[in-house]
């Protein structure tokens, strides 16, 4: 995969009109887009279907979690939409149900381990007695056992997650901040170059591109930073 196949731009905007303008601005530079709750509830599912039909790859970030049958039914319908990736929380029974429902569809299911906006204090407040690092590795192992296609985790855990899940699973990393950019509300962040060197296979970049004065230039800067990490001489 080249950098263009690995960069996922998060369409973190409130309206379809804004998303359409952004996709038009970025043009052929960007192949892969993430669509989450904000846009889904503004009519984003139909927009996602249209983008996929136009040749773009879509990462539908729904973070599903429910009883097995409900998760399976949702995954079956999403698989028919031509999506490339779908997230669900990394709970074993839900993951197993999703894997069975997606079989043969080409949909890559991603287990969400610990949100990159969370740290140990946040987990403790939510009732977890594990630190983020330990919980990520535990859930990564459960995702592999369930037959998931990949993991969502911070780049800080990518190298150890790779040891847990083996060579074939995708490691999708949010919380990516290009060199010199603001961290925003993310607590576990890394640059594109460092994330790829750490073992991430796909990088999700939202606000540093979407909110940039010149999104196309910002996207190209990220791609260039990624190329630097992927170039054989830098391996």
UniProtKB/Swiss-Prot annotation:
One of its GO terms (biological process) is 'de novo' pyrimidine nucleobase biosynthetic process. Gene3D superfamilies: Aldolase class I (3.20.20.70). It catalyses: orotidine 5'-phosphate + H(+) = UMP + CO2. Homodimer. Substrate binds at residues 12, 34, 61-70, 116, 177, 186, 206-207. Keywords: Decarboxylase, Lyase, Pyrimidine biosynthesis. GO terms for cellular component: cytosol. Transmembrane segments: none annotated. This is Orotidine 5'-phosphate decarboxylase. The gene is pyrF. Pfam families: OMPdecase (PF00215). Belongs to the OMP decarboxylase family. Type 1 subfamily. InterPro entries: Aldolase_TIM, OMPdecase, OMPdecase_AS, OMPdecase_bac, OMPdeCOase_dom, RibuloseP-bd_barrel. Its EC number is 4.1.1.23. NCBIfam families: PRK00230.1, pyrF. HAMAP family: OMPdecase_type1_B. Catalyzes the decarboxylation of orotidine 5'-monophosphate (OMP) to uridine 5'-monophosphate (UMP). Pathway: Pyrimidine metabolism; UMP biosynthesis via de novo pathway; UMP from orotate: step 2/2. It comes from Rhizobium etli (strain ATCC 51251 / DSM 11541 / JCM 21823 / NBRC 15573 / CFN 42). SMART domains: OMPdecase (SM00934).
